[in-house]
């Protein structure tokens, strides 16, 4: 495994490449709201060691990517983040497999309906408008005129860090960043529309038993929506990527990819 971070038009990308080249499609990982590529590092290491070429991008205004002007950022839709995905995919030059988490799962769906992808993996993902949207009561109303700041730690722990120990939860909470209020509304209030007939690739959906943000029942609906294979993870919450036992999720994804003959 080799690590090689780079930038594409202000988009910071973490690249983990395998020791030996293969003909497999690259894996492009898309993080969720308020997060960054750091959230994928366990998976980047796991899959690159298994022979996959892995890229984890950062949306604009997230982690080490460049920041857009305030007015532009607060009005950004999740659909707009397909811009970052497209630029990274173009720089790779190969049709990828897209793996998205949470709000990044909606970004992945938006991208897949406008650009060709080999496969789509949706991990505790935001669901399309066609399936309704779980209304999450936040501690304070969303102010559309300013960036949305991560909620207080105890509330964030209930949403993001179920089944995560206190020390790890605080470490990850410290890495959270501001989000576009428009994107947050799309995720927890009214959703974005998806034309599933425009997504012509195999889809895997992963849901978690304890997830309050993207409830497991919603993940089952999402799998049915796409006629996709569904993986149910017991004893875990919304954050499946860094919690103890994350390997179970990575292995399920890898096994599914092999079933698709990748």
What is the predicted function of each stretch?
Residues 32-35, 209:
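Active-site glycine-rich loops that stabilize anionic/oxyanionic intermediates
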Residues 34-42, 54:
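Serine-hydrolase catalytic-loop signature spanning alpha/beta hydrolases and amidase-signature enzymes
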Residues 44-69:
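Conserved alpha/beta-hydrolase
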Residues 62-96:
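Active-site loop/oxyanion-hole signature of alpha/beta-hydrolase fold enzymes
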Residues 113-147, 186-190:
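Flexible "cap/lid" loop of the alpha/beta hydrolase fold
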Residues 199, 205-207:
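Short beta-strand/loop motif that positions the catalytic acidic residue
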Residues 207-236:
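Conserved loop-alpha-helix segment in the C-terminal half of the alpha/beta-hydrolase fold
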Residues 231-262:
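Catalytic active-site module of serine/aspartate enzymes centered on a nucleophile-bearing elbow/loop
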